[in-house]
Amino acid sequence: MKLLFLFFICLSFQITAQNVSEFSIGDRIIMDSEILDEERILNVYLPYGYSPDSTKTYPVIYLLDGSAHEDFIHVAGLVQFGSYSWINIVPESIVVGIENVSRNRDFTGETRNSLHKDAYPEMGGSANFIQYLDSEVFAYIDDNYNTTDERTIIGQSLGGLLATEILLKQPQMFNNYIIISPSLWFDYESYLDIEMKQTQEKLKIYVGVGDEGKIMKNAAKKLHKKLKKELKENDQLSWGYFKDNDHGDVLHFAVYDAFEHFFNQEK
């Protein structure tokens, strides 16, 4: 009995004596934004083998709703998995997740809907947020990491609304747009009336939606139809409908599908 007791004591000591260290998949950047006049956080996933001393460069995927408790972890996992040589649906990429402070403010433009104005008085800050992306976030990432000129944006719901606004007004900001379940009901679907600004760069655009109700599905279809008419001949437009997924889980499946549409043909 004493021997058994001593065995468990020794086993317990061995377990507690193991070294424990922090597990990290990238960097957490705290930056002061002059444009937004507030502190913002960026989460950065780096590909396996990334070295700041290497001459190898990587495309960058910018993820809205990019905190650890939102979409950063699972999207970074998709990028890691999809870039394995035996999967090869997306190139090795840096993922930049932009943590939210107020998505109602940052992802929406002005609205004529008085109910929304009263309920969410902070709405209407998308122009400042887009400037923050274009002037501060891009500059920081390009100055501190080994990046190429290729940029992808991923946005869902209100994030999809913002990605749509950028696509229509400043399409040169990104090469690839993954727009999932965009909240185009906002401001009486006025974004669908914006004439898309043209850019010389080739664009790849993916619009996806799940089984999320008539309003959301119809708005996504209208956006896809609008883009078919307004995109250049050499632009690429893809569509995804996920009947078995709803607003809560469609992003994960749609992003994987978008990667296959965008990059799988480049194998």
Model-derived features: positions:
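Conserved acidic catalytic loop of the alpha/beta-hydrolase fold
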Residues: 131-149
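Alpha/beta-hydrolase fold nucleophile elbow
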Residues: 145-156, 177
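Gly/Ala-rich beta-loop-alpha elbow adjacent to hydrolase catalytic centers
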Residues: 155-159, 163
